[in-house]
């Protein structure tokens, strides 16, 4: 069987470009204003000795200074760049090339680029890293106070099951999103084609956090199965919402299999599920606390850590914007920024409920005190009244208001 001439030509060109390509060994470079760095351009898999006399034309930018043209010597060319003004991710790339005896550049320049970030201060960059790891740790640890509280009380009374169910669905979708974006080569290839020369959208710490969060939610659900839960159930409204979210994910799978959308579009749809969950998951717990007039059973430690993580996340964005003089992160992705503020807003609501509105509530299993359940003054006063008052307290039914 003979192949069409166009296909044969494409294969031949692809084979040539696969050999004669230029790469940059330093894909990410960070320098301060007034500092310099050396970037290496290298011709890989060369097939002709004439390519050793190649001149590469480089891009120019007001943020960095570099030569217009660099001469390749012995298949290598070192380029010195200096930072002029703060900028994030400025691309230095090879625009064209000329070789003795050839009128057209025969080199593949697709990978001949470097992302250069010019910062104001290295000390500020170190602070940004510290803040980043701190909020990562705070968010990662934030799941454990609730699990510990459930274990100490041997009860999940006070933990709203709607919140927990939505959290499991949200982090399940988020974990799948990160796993596919980080490990699936097909997804990464499509992303690279649609977003050429963009940094990876998902890093390993994103994958670790998402999977860890999903497992933590799953363990908490197991506690709800084995510990006392009174009459608490998942509400009908929450079940309908979860069915809707799962159905959306299932439809996305179907249209992906039918080649109506790419697998990258399917992966992005998983992030929409997480965003939808974040927007609505806090309402059930806040309303549940209001109904019970108590936060006992709902760990304030979780909220304090989540508030710390969210606040430090925004602080890191501010510090990064200052260091590179780029505030686009706040308006270029308003959804992410808005969701962060939604979480912080509800964290403040929960802290007001716990410390101001319902600090002395009497509910079942309030005998565990500490950071999660402060010792109510009313219980201390009752203990001082003697046996008569104690008998009265023992005969009084716990105060719980059900849905």
UniProtKB/Swiss-Prot annotation:
Sorted alphabetically, which keywords does the UniProt record give?
Answer: Cytoplasmic vesicle, Glycoprotein, Lysosome, Membrane, Repeat, Symport, Transmembrane, Transmembrane helix, Transport
Which parts of the chain does the record assign to the membrane side Cytoplasmic?
144-162, 228-237, 284-294, 358-403
All residue ranges annotated as the PQ-loop domain in the record: 124-190, 266-326
Q: Name one GO biological process term.
A: phagocytosis
Q: Which family does it belong to?
A: Belongs to the cystinosin family.
Gene name per UniProt? ctns-1
Q: Which InterPro entries match?
A: LC_transporter, PQ-loop_rpt
Query: Which parts of this chain are annotated as the region Disordered?
Result: 374-403
Annotated catalysed reactions: L-cystine(out) + H(+)(out) = L-cystine(in) + H(+)(in)
MF terms from GO for this chain are: L-cystine transmembrane transporter activity; symporter activity
Q: Which residues lie on this side of the membrane: Lumenal?
A: 1-122, 184-206, 259-260, 316-336
Its record classes its membrane topology as:
Multi-pass membrane protein
Basic and acidic residues bias locations: 374-388
TM stretches of this protein: 123-143, 163-183, 207-227, 238-258, 261-283, 295-315, 337-357
Tell me which GO cellular component terms the UniProt record holds.
Answer: lysosomal membrane; lysosome; phagocytic vesicle
According to the record, glycans are attached at 45, 52, 78, 96
Purpose of the protein: Cystine/H(+) symporter that mediates export of cystine, the oxidized dimer of cysteine, from lysosomes. May play a role in the degradation of engulfed apoptotic cells.
Q: Which Pfam families match?
A: PQ-loop (PF04193)
Protein's UniProt name? Cystinosin homolog
């Amino acid at each position: 069987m003979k192949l069409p001439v166009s296909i044969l030509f494409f294969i031949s060109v692809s084979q040539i470009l696969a050999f004669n390509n230029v790469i940059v060994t330093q894909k990410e470079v960070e320098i301060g204003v007034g500092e310099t760095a050396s970037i290496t351009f290298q011709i890989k898999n060369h097939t002709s000795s004439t390519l050793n006399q190649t001149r590469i034309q480089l891009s120019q930018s007001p943020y960095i200074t570099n030569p217009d043209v660099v001469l390749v010597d012995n298949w290598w060319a070192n380029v010195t760049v200096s930072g002029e003004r703060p900028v994030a991710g400025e691309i230095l790339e090879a625009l064209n090339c000329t070789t003795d005896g050839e009128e057209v550049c025969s080199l593949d320049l697709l990978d001949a680029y470097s992302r250069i970030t010019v910062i104001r201060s290295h000390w500020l960059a170190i602070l940004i890293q510290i803040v980043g790891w701190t909020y990562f740790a705070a968010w990662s640890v934030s799941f454990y106070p609730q699990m510990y509280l459930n274990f100490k009380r041997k009860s999940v009374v006070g933990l709203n099951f709607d919140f927990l169910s939505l959290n499991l669905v949200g982090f399940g979708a988020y974990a799948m999103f990160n796993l596919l974006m980080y490990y699936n080569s097909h997804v990464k290839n499509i992303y690279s084609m649609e977003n050429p020369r963009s940094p990876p959208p998902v890093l390993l710490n994103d994958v670790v956090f998402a999977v860890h969060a999903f497992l933590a939610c799953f363990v908490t659900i197991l506690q709800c199965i084995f510990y006392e839960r009174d009459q608490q159930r998942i509400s009908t409204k929450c079940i309908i919402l979860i069915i809707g979210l799962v159905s959306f994910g299932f439809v996305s799978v179907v249209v992906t299999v039918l080649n109506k959308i790419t697998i990258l579009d399917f992966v992005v749809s998983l992030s929409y599920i997480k965003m939808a969950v974040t927007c609505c998951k806090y309402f059930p717990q806040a309303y549940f606390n209001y109904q019970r007039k108590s936060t006992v059973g709902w760990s304030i430690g979780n909220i304090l850590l989540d508030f710390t993580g969210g606040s430090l996340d925004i602080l890191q964005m501010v510090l990064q914007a200052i260091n590179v003089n780029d505030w686009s992160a706040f308006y270029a992705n308003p959804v992410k920024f808005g969701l962060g503020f939604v979480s912080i807003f509800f964290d403040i609501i929960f802290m007001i409920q716990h410390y101001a509105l319902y600090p002395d509530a009497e509910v079942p299993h309030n005998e565990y005190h500490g950071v999660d359940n402060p010792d109510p003054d009313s219980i201390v006063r009752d203990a001082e009244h003697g046996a008569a008052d104690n008998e009265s307290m023992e005969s009084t039914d716990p105060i719980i208001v059900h849905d």
